[in-house]
A protein has these predicted regions:
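Short beta-strand immediately N-terminal to the catalytic nucleophile in serine-hydrolase-like folds
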Residues: 44-46, 71
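Active-site nucleophile elbow and catalytic-triad environment of alpha/beta-hydrolase enzymes
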Residues: 143, 147-169
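Acidic catalytic loop of the alpha/beta-hydrolase fold
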Residues: 144-145, 183-193
Length: 193
């Protein structure tokens, strides 16, 4: 599990006191290093938030990575990142960093569900075409939990760093990258990637 996720997380949606995004990436590096095996290619697959972490990992640690697979990823321009980062940091400064933020959750995710909104639907209908899978996600306490204000600040900070196109020069020119996106995935621009 990522930091702030899973049954062992001390607080769901909270990553670290400081530099949570970097801590997530370093945690991923620890996992990647522990899985390294001589003679086997190192391929990193990330989905959704994991795709953003995989992109950051590839930018920081491109050596030894043979391929990158990004599923359900997207591009977030600087103004959009700042629109989330500023209120998240303000809540942290007001001492609410460790508390789940329904406001930031709506800001971050409500637009994803707009094309799928229907009577009797859920706020998570955008996640899958399979209504049973959506319901399983909604009822699982370890899925769809609301991040803390600090967790959102870390996420928006990470997305802001990924929006800096000058950083792309850190990727090796020959690194194979496979982009996957569902045809109705709002994070991937409805299949446009």
């Amino acid at each position: 599990n990522h930091l702030g996720h899973g049954a062992e997380a001390p607080r769901l949606g909270w990553f670290a006191k400081r530099n949570g995004w970097s801590r997530l990436v370093e945690d991923l590096k620890t996992v990647m290093d522990s899985l390294a095996a001589p003679g086997l290619p190192r391929v990193l697959l990330g989905h959704s938030m994991g795709s953003f972490l995989a992109r950051e990992y590839a930018l920081r640690y491109p050596d030894g990575l043979e391929a990158l697979v990004l599923s359900g990823t997207g591009w977030h321009p600087k103004p959009l990142c700042m629109a989330g980062l500023l209120p998240a940091k303000a809540l942290c400064l007001l001492g609410r960093g460790h508390k789940p933020s329904a406001l930031l959750d709506r800001l971050a995710f409500s637009a994803n569900n707009r094309p799928f909104a229907k009577a009797g639907g859920t706020a998570c209908d955008w996640l899958s075409r399979d209504a049973q899978q959506v319901q399983a996600y909604v009822t699982d306490p370890l899925c769809g939990f609301v991040f803390t204000a600090s967790g959102f600040a870390d996420l928006f900070d990470g997305l802001l760093n990924l929006s800096r196109t000058a950083r792309l020069k850190n990727l090796p020119g020959g690194l194979p990258v496979l982009l996957l996106s569902g045809s109705r995935d709002p994070v991937g621009g409805m299949g446009k990637g």
